[in-house]
Amino acid sequence: EVQTGKGIFVKRNTISGSIYFKLVKINYLEIIEIKAFLEQKVIEKIIHSITPAQCEKLECYLRAMESAAKDDVYSAADDFKFHKIIIDASPNKTMGQMIFELRKVLDNYAMEFKDTNSTWIYTIPYHRELLNAFKEGNLKKACDAHNKIYKTDISLFSKIDSQRK
C-alpha cells in the first residue's frame, strides 16, 4: 500500500502484531539454551497429544538416521524432518517459527567447521529414547532424552567456540 503526503510512505506487508528480531551480537551457547528451552516447551505441549501417525513418521525418519549412522554418516536432512514433525505438532506455531530461525543460525555457524556430524551422530540413540517416550506419553523420559541431545549440542558448540578463539 502506498500513501502520499510529504514524501511517500510504503506500508510494510506484515501481520499486525508481528515481531522481527535481528541478533546483533551472537552467543551461540545462549542460542542453544533458548532453542532447547523452546523445544522443551513443545515437548510438554504435545506429549499427550502426539498421534500414532506422527510417531510413525518420526519412526521413519529415525530409521533413516540409524541406517545412515551404520555407515558413519549423520543425516542432517532426516534429523531436520524428525524435529519438524515434533515442532509442527505444537499448537503454538510462533514458537515453532522461532525454533526454526534459531536452528538456521546454529546450522549456518556449525557448517563453518569440520566434523560436526561426527558429534551429532551420537545423538541418534537419544532420538530413539525421545520417540519411545512420545509413544509412552512419558514426559520425564522425553525431557531426559531431549536434555541429552541439548548437552551434546552444548558440547559441540563449546568445542567450536574454543577453536574460534
Indicate where each model-derived feature is located.
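Conserved amphipathic alpha-helical segments that form helical-bundle/coiled-coil interaction surfaces
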Residues: I34-E112, Y122-E129, A133, K141-S155
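Non-transmembrane, amphipathic alpha-helical segments
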Residues: L23-N27, I50, D115
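Generic C-terminal helix-cap and adjacent flexible tail
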Residues: S155-K165
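Ubiquitous "structural anchor" signal
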Residues: N13-I15, A145, Y150, D161
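Short linear motifs at protein or domain termini
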Residues: E1-L38, Q163-K165
